[in-house]
Amino acid sequence: MKLPKTLLFGFFFGIIFSSAAQEIIVHDPVVAKQDGTYYLFNTGHGISVHSSTDLENWKQEEPVFSEKPEWTDEVVADFKNHIWAPDIFEKDETYYLYYSVSSFAKNTSAIGVATNSTLNPNDPHYNWQDHGIVVQSVPNRDMWNAIDPNMIEGEDGTVWMAFGSFWDGLKLVKMDDDLTKIAEPEVWHTIARRERSFKLPDTDPGDAALEAPFLFKKNGYYYQFLSWDLCCRGDQSTYKVVVGRSKDVTGPYVDKEGKPLNEGGGTLLIEGNENWYGAGHNSTYTFDGKDYIFFHAYDANDKGAPKLKIAELKWDEEQWPSLKEGVLK
């Protein structure tokens, strides 16, 4: 769930880029690179945007939406244009920006999508065209939450959307050819879940705390990074990042010990220490031959301000990821 969070950041190994990058205030960062410039999109009013040529020095750009998309009030009454957890995806020279509209701690939610031919706001062709709802969840109807989208293209060219938060786990759904709707007939898979107490009402997010799947192709596998446990609880936060993998985009995903993510499996990648109130909602990319993980972490020494973190991934002999040497202090 993507409102301001006081998360707990992990004791982990990583190269963290310059202080300029660390000082950027973000939630749920995703990134695309076009013509030598990195464009970062994150949770914020109208979807916040930053640009950089070096992953260190960032320029704030105008938000994607100066006014809320027209359809949002149909999902969330009196929606304030605070849009959560975007994902940016490029195919056939078109950029697709998926985003989340929701009420905190409810599955009154929908994922929308907008398209653009360029990410450069100075390009005369720069214009975000909104296409409305891709998928919507409704309380007492659905046991899943339509937020936290992530797009992945399979080996056969089929595009899938992973998404979800709490309830009965994280989902993967096949997209139609224009990537603005779910394919018909619908094809759904559950790609991660944790045990949920049967005593809770269906409208309750539940105690199976997981969200924000991000799928990444590497080494002949699809890796699923996801966030576990609780944010938003100050120094009691337990938010962390775990990972699993599969040979098939639809799963089953398993952790390093072979436990399925659908049965609560997950290999720990990032967890907290006394200096950071959590890390989560990561994205993972290959830029210029190097693999990077982007995420936000809350600074215990700066009143819990959420900071952008970027680390380089490394891979062991069994092709499992960890973060590069060095400990975040």
Which stretches of residues belong to each language-model region?
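Bacterial Sec-dependent N-terminal signal peptides
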Residues: 1-22
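Carbohydrate-active catalytic/glycan-binding domains of CAZyme proteins
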Residues: 20-329
